[in-house]
């Protein structure tokens, strides 16, 4: 299957080097990111999930480790907003041009501000969705931040 998606094309246009990883996507999977991490044999803390949120009613994109939970309070603060909530899946699909389970912070149809969980960036390589269910891209965190024109912020709920 082709690895050319709007996300991989955006990375190429940005001049970012990356490698692709494919796995068998299982529809209806509860924790897509954890399933992807297991399928590609990578630590779930390095496999990041892309979550579309609404901050004060406007779209934004939060990218966090697949084994962590997003804090709505922290994501609102990261974007200088008063409130945040998860975006309904159908709205996220219309806005990004990607299907749920395949949403990437790169190459979205309608660009939204992006923030990455800062604690996930202290590794040589992170893995994110490549714009299609079952397709991941692996690249250095600094390149991912630059390509997504993203900020690094504290976005996750406390563990424990």
Task: Locate predicted features.
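Extended, low-hydrophobicity, polar/charged segments
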Residues: 1-160
